[in-house]
Curated annotation (Swiss-Prot):
SS bond partners: 4-20, 8-22, 13-27
Record lineage: Eukaryota, Viridiplantae, Streptophyta, Embryophyta, Tracheophyta
Organ and tissue specificity: Expressed in petals, petioles, roots and runners but not in leaves (at protein level).
Keywords: Disulfide bond, Knottin, Plant defense
Designated name of the protein: Cycloviolacin-O4
SUPFAM superfamilies: Cyclotides
Family classification: Belongs to the cyclotide family. Bracelet subfamily.
Length: 30
């Protein structure tokens, strides 16, 4: 539930390496 400061509209979350996932076009962690 914490925003990772990254969007995932066109590309996947690069921050997925630290546990972020795409939700509603924004990358979130928990």
């Amino acid at each position: 539930g914490i925003p990772c400061g990254e969007s995932c509209v066109w590309i996947p979350c690069i921050s997925s390496a630290i546990g972020c996932s795409c939700k509603n076009k924004v990358c979130y962690r928990n």
